Amino acid sequence: MLVIIPSAGIGSRLDLHTKYFNKSMIQLGDTPVISKIIDSYPKQTRFIVITGYQGVHIKEYLRLVYPKRNIKIINVDLFEGPGSGLSYTLSKSLKFINEPFFFHANDTIFTDKKFYSNIKKDTMFLHKANCDTMKFATVEINKINKKIHNKLNYLRKDFFNYTGVGFIKDFKKFKKLIKNYKVNEGELSYFKSLDPNKINFKFIKNWFDIGSKETKEKAEDF
């Protein structure tokens, strides 16, 4: 099993929380977020962690805490300003992707056990509660339509939040899309290229997002 964790961005929505640390190193209790992510997968999992902003801290931490785990660390040189973004970050990992994989955002934590089990087809992990189309990418699902949306400039409560975790089956197509990206949509560009009726939309019971000050505060009780 391969899991890719992009962790290059500056975490601007967290303000002072990320002044000195990458947001994946923010602690919930005694444990950094990145450990909660890594520990949610089987020990034999292979990880690719893509660093940039304050990446030295991540690299040192992972080598100290997980000396026997299969973790490939890639550093990107551009993580803020023009030209930066998730698609650029992912483009630096393409030569190491040679199998289907899980994409796992570095600000997403699940408490659902073995959420990765029996995933064989393209999958987006969704959450039903507190939909916010202005803060999150969402999926519209009804009897007539299935559609993936980026953040919108209006609020809809009848869509489902995309948690930032997905399983990408056709890794060759993904690599081609990211290599030739025109719009900086990251992994969403892959899912939006698919027939939505062929995507597995899996609902997560417990999702904690630490990507903003408000959602981080809710996750601190986890």
Question: Language model features by range: what are they?
Answer:
Residues 1-3, 159-222:
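Conserved alpha/beta core of the MobA/IspD/sugar-nucleotide pyrophosphorylase nucleotidyltransferase superfamily
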Residues 2-5, 13, 27, 31-100:
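Conserved N-terminal catalytic core of the sugar/cofactor nucleotidyltransferase
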Residues 7, 51, 105, 126-127:
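Short beta-strand/turn micro-motifs composed of small residues
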Residues 9, 107, 212:
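Active-site glycine-centered loops adjacent to acidic/histidine catalytic or metal-binding residues
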Residues 11-15, 134:
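Short N-terminal binding/cap micro-motifs at the start of the first secondary-structure element
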Residues 19-24:
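Short alpha-helical oligomerization interface
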Residues 99-109:
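Short beta-strand-to-loop acidic/aromatic patch adjacent to the donor-nucleotide binding site
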Residues 110-185:
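Conserved core of the sugar-phosphate nucleotidyltransferase
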